Each structure stands twice: as C-alpha cells, then as structure tokens.
C-alpha cells in the first residue's frame, strides 16, 4: 500500500473520515443511487508545508471560469462516476485532493490518486469562492437526492417562494431551529448546466439548502456534517408531511404563532 496524504496528519484524516461517514449516510438513506450526488470540502486549514510542496499527479485542468478567492486553496472532491457507498469505505480511492493554481482558473490533483473530480466541480467551487468572499466560514458543499423532498418538487404548488419552507418548518420544531433559513427552490434546469449552477449560486445567497426541482438538493455548511444535518432535518419534515397525507389527512402543522414563538425563544433569523 502506497503512502497516503493522510499518514501522520490526524486532523486531516479526521476530516476525511467525516466525509466518508456522511457518504455512508447518503447511501444508507437511499439518496445516492449509483454514482449520484457529490461532496466537495475545503481542507485548506489542514494543509501543511509538506502538502504545499507535493507535486501534481495530474495535468493542469481548467475549472471553466476564474474564481478569484480560491487562489492556493485545497479541496477534497468526490470523483466523477464514483459511488457514495464506495467513498464511505475507501475515500482516498474514490475522491482526490486538488490544489487551485495561482491563475484561479485551473487546478491539479495532488493526492492520493489521479481520481478525476466530479463534472459538477465548477459549480461547487463557485459556491466555495463566494463563501470565502463573504467570510462565511462555510467549508462544505453536498449535493444529493433525498426521496421525499424530490417527490414534493413534482407538485407546482410547493415551488412558490417559501411555500415549502413554511410547510417543513411547521412539521416539527427542530426543522425551524436547525434550518432557520428555510429551503430555497431552483426551477428545473439541465443537470450539470451553467444555468443550474448560476441559479443555485443566486439562491444560496438567502438559503443554506436549495431544492433542485425534480432532481435533488444542494447544501452548504460549516463542515460536511452540518450540510448533511440540514438536509436530514428537512427530509424528516417532508416525510412527516407525506406520511400524514398517506394516512388520509392534511397535517395541521405548527401555527404561525407557534413558529414565531420559536424564533423569539431561539433568536432565529426568520
């Protein structure tokens, strides 16, 4: 077995283990069929001088746009065509560490293997670029296909601004507490398209989690577990709603007054 970038770097290993753990949850929840979904995490804070000196193990690859705040940043990215269930067991065989070059428009792979990152890397990196610009502290992006949330996106009634947010908040107090910005919605666009990436970036100005109509969700978080937790909580609310409907009744949900009380009690932004 060859040497890994994780050897002797416990903090970095712990971060990659966290990514692997979340990949396992995505698979176990049925949200990551075949090679569905992506994870990209900014690991620059764990990079030492020895890592900075590592040579490239790939050719220089274009990002597709210039992202001025990513100069010299390092990311762990799930590989294109790789499965979450495999990422959960063998993260360094199913993802790679990349370095953004000084032109802010290209990158190289530096470890462990020359696993080509996801084709959705440009859209993930654009979100990371914006988070650094804002100084938000967000380090992780996750794209996955939560069953109940995608199912609800097939009904146009739910796609108006904050319609789903209000419904999901009202199903269980934790949703409003732990997803206080709610759920943004991006109308259907071709997967992997520039339009989808731009619309997602715009919607993430106001939300931490965005629903892609008839496709999946895209979330940003302080780390990969934070991004997962928000998706998980929203999905629980969606399941409660759909279970109520399956039992033949419309759930009453928490009242506006009860949700306002939550906002006051926990100093929530909305």
Regions found by a protein language model. Name each.
Residues 1-270:
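Glycine-rich flexible loops
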